[in-house]
Amino acid sequence: MPGVDRERRTIPVPLPEGLPAGPRALLVLEEPASAPAAVAALDPVDGTLRLRVSEPAGGRVSVLVLVPVVDATALWLPGSDRDQSGLPPSWADDLAFSPFAGAPLGSLIGRNDRPVVTFGARAQGGRLRMRAGMVEETAELLVAFTADLSAGGLEVVLDLARDDFGAAVGRVRDAVGLRRPAVAAENHRPVLCTWYSFHQALDQDRLLAQARTAASMGFGTVIIDDGWQTSDNDRGYGSCGDWRVEPSKIADGAALVSELAGLGLRTLFWVGTPFLGYRSAAYAERGLPTLYDEPAMEAAVLDPRSRRVRGHLVERLTALLRDTGAAGLKIDFLERFGVDDPAASPEDCGGESVVRAALALLDDLHASASAVRPEPMIEFREPYWSPETLRRTTMMRVADCPLSPVRNRVGIVDLRLATAGVAVHSDPIMWAAADTPERVAQHLHSSLFGVPQVSIALDGQSPEQSATLRTWMRFWTEHRDVLLHGRLRVVGIASDYAAVEAARDDVVITAQYAPVISDAPAHASTWIVVNAHEQEILLRSAAPRPARYSIVDCTGTTVDEGEQVLDGLTAFAVPAGGVLRLTFRER
């Protein structure tokens, strides 16, 4: 079989009746002396195909699934850094997944953005590898999942329904554990982040001045990013590990948090959790066990298997919340814990793996923090979204992508589709000082379907830039229930989502990120279309739909209004960064 070592033993897995013609599944044995137990069955609730593999004796096993490729156009794999535009070969490199390195989830996309097959998997041990690509000899999609069964079983989930893309992804997402209980409302409030606007050069007076402006714009949270814990501005991580507020940057952490709270703003502090900086007191005095050094970062990575390490971090971070009154933490760099276990273990190790110990650290921290701050707000970011980490966070942010609206958009939509219950946040939005209001709007459009984080010097913007930010903050706040909790529909998956639509009750909001034709919703009373490109807006209606319309530019200024019957194709001259609002009259 193409893509399979001919020395490996392969065993066909019988599939249940009632499936579309064509799919087949096999086990590829790498290490087990005996064949693992494999059961395939259709789930009676969601109709997905579940393949469960177990082997008490352990060993590495691969589950291979082959599906005929008909009308395939692209392979969707969630992640802001993924290329969604093509079809990789079956011999492409494996992708490695762990609790701190994403989740194996994907969909083969056919014409009109319809799924051919949607797939995912979960290994009880948390680690597995996935390979997905086209078999050129047979015109099939090969999806292979490999896991070590000594850590527990492996379950593969397939959805063969060629219906709605978002619905298919949702069924597989839920089956592999990527849904958590809905988080509290404060996690969905817009965020002013200090990173791109200050970097480490924090200034308390300037921060407070900008916070006052942010509060007037509708922001609800301030993230005090890297820099609060160090007296220098050198961008390294040599000061990490003590996690005490540096008085030269913030004279009184509790007073600052209290003043921000008086403005209606919650405060989160950034922490580079794994790092033990070479210049920290903890590095010099405590002799904490480490996994490895990162000289370029001026730090070592702590070994979470050590009870002393976990105790140190829990004590320091809980004290930070208790002493300042902060609402939570932005926990960064957790992917540093996603490593294979070193040969040597610290003396106070309980026998768990590095990954399991890191998860235990997060649990200990949550329990301790909750005692001083009920329901703490916790931010994680790509790539550490997984079934294991999702329930340990309340906010999931797109990976760093400064000045990249496309990556922000793709990351937000991917996380919205691939997870449920958590608040999905943009990477902090920034723009150049000379950017036009239309360009500023383009950056803000990128975060429409997630919670916007902004990191820009609010006191350094032109009147037009400020007006654009205020307009879009007002728009997002007014429509956040639809944007965040409406049913998502995407167009142009292989084109980084040419259009995205959210619908809730009788309101539909469509953002066109490229010149496309958007179809009028059949039952909505209000249709809002955002022009996130440079051309006119084209709409299509299968039947005459009389409507009242208004058009505003990116600063919120009305440029046109009137009445129009949508019938067939209709063009509207909406300025770049502007909004078309249609209110349909009863027919």
Q: Where are the regions a protein language model picked out?
A:
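N-terminal accessory beta-strand-rich subdomains and adjacent acidic, glycine-rich linkers
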Residues: 1-178, 523-526, 538-551, 555-556, ...
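Glycine-rich, aromatic-flanked loop segments that form ligand/cofactor-binding clefts
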Residues: 165-179, 221-226, 248-298, 375-380, ...
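Active-site-adjacent "subsite" loops/lids of carbohydrate-active enzymes
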Residues: 189, 196-200, 266-323, 414-415
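Active-site and adjacent substrate-binding regions of carbohydrate-active enzymes
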Residues: 199, 217, 226, 260, ...
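Acidic-and-aromatic substrate-binding clefts and catalytic sites of carbohydrate-active enzymes
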Residues: 199-204, 245-250, 274-277, 385-388, ...
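Catalytic domains of carbohydrate-active enzymes, especially glycoside hydrolases
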Residues: 206-231, 323, 327
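Aromatic- and acidic-residue-enriched carbohydrate-binding clefts of CAZyme catalytic domains
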Residues: 228-253, 280-304, 335-359, 365
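Active-site-proximal substrate-binding groove within the catalytic cores of carbohydrate-active enzymes
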Residues: 361-577, 583-585
